[in-house]
């Protein structure tokens, strides 16, 4: 698993690890949350052993609370997708033609699956989506794993890499992982 780091380097008792796996066109993104003091808001009570699937209704502004994210970018162009989901099975996907240039006409038609469980007493979330319908995504692609947490210490921004003077998951310098068919992180 990939350990995510807070931008602010706050003294929190939280650790977040993430991973991804592409098998054919099925992308599974997973997050393991170590929050023994249950500091996260809008996350507890954590409902383990839960599975929800189908064409779920996407929601806006998930990043205003605890939200798990993955960014998938083409290696040749600046097109990229941003997936957001939370422990309540709320999700969304956005398409950008370039840095922060959201294509408003993009309407996701994706079958998604969210599953939750406990791993050694810690919350584990997995989000699976068939990426075949993401026409502008070409493999191999670049990946940025990220999380926004809202807790007792306020809002924190987590990623495997932070490059700028402020947290910016869209910054292409943070897309440091590779997505290839039938492979996970590299």
Task: Briefly describe each language-model feature range.
Residues 22-27, 73-78, 118-121, 134-139:
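A short, structured loop/turn motif at beta-sheet edges
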Residues 100-120, 178-181:
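Active-site/ligand-binding surface loops and adjacent short beta/alpha elements
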Residues 109-150:
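Extended, acidic-biased charged interface segments
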């Amino acid at each position: 698993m990939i350990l995510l780091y807070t931008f602010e380097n706050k003294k929190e008792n939280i650790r977040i690890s993430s991973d991804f796996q592409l098998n054919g066109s099925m992308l599974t993104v997973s997050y393991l949350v170590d929050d023994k003091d249950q500091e996260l808001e809008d996350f507890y009570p954590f409902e383990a052993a839960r599975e929800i699937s189908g064409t779920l209704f996407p929601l806006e502004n998930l990043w205003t609370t605890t939200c798990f994210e993955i960014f998938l970018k083409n290696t040749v162009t600046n097109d990229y997708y941003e997936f957001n989901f939370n422990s309540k099975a709320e999700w969304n996907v956005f398409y950008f033609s370039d840095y922060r240039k959201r294509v408003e006409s993009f309407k996701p038609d994706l079958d998604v699956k969210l599953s939750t469980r406990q791993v050694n007493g810690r919350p584990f979330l997995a989000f699976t989506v068939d990426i075949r319908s993401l026409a502008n995504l070409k493999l191999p692609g670049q990946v940025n794993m990220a999380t926004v947490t809202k807790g007792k210490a306020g809002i924190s921004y987590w990623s495997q890499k932070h490059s700028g003077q402020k947290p910016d998951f869209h910054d292409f310098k943070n897309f440091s992982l590779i997505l290839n068919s039938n492979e996970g992180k590299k």
